[in-house]
UniProtKB/Swiss-Prot annotation:
Pfam families reported in the protein's UniProt record: Ribosomal_L27
A cellular-component GO term for this protein: cytosolic large ribosomal subunit
Protein name according to UniProt: Large ribosomal subunit protein bL27
Coiled-coil segments: none
The species this protein was found in: Cereibacter sphaeroides (strain ATCC 17023 / DSM 158 / JCM 6121 / CCUG 31486 / LMG 2827 / NBRC 12203 / NCIMB 8253 / ATH 2.4.1.) (Rhodobacter sphaeroides)
Record's keyword annotation contains Ribonucleoprotein: yes
Domain of life from the UniProt record: Bacteria
GO MF annotation list: structural constituent of ribosome
Family in the record: Belongs to the bacterial ribosomal protein bL27 family.
Length: 89
């Protein structure tokens, strides 16, 4: 009678779901107030003109216009929303 001694249970096999971070609106795309542009942990991107930053560092549009990514000082990337001509009138 062949028997096998019971093996121990594995302590692996768990993983957390992805957090869905990253760029949601890219440069040149249209944005309206409240649109989320970037979800991030910490400040990979910094807020520029026409955008705000939430408690969790989410960058969102505060004006209607086009999204722009621009390099700034110290290697920082700033995100702005430039008002479109018809939105400014």
């Amino acid at each position: 009678m062949a028997h096998k001694k019971a093996g121990g249970s594995s302590r692996n096999g768990r993983d957390s779901a992805g957090r869905r971070l990253g760029v949601k609106l890219y440069g040149g795309q249209a944005a309206i107030p409240g649109n989320i542009i970037v979800r991030q942990r910490g400040t990979t991107w910094f807020p520029g003109a026409g955008v705000g930053m939430g408690r969790d560092h989410t960058i969102f549009a505060t004006v209607e216009g086009r999204v722009e990514f621009r390099k700034g000082l110290k290697g920082r990337t700033f995100i702005s929303v430039l008002p479109t001509a018809e939105a400014a009138e």
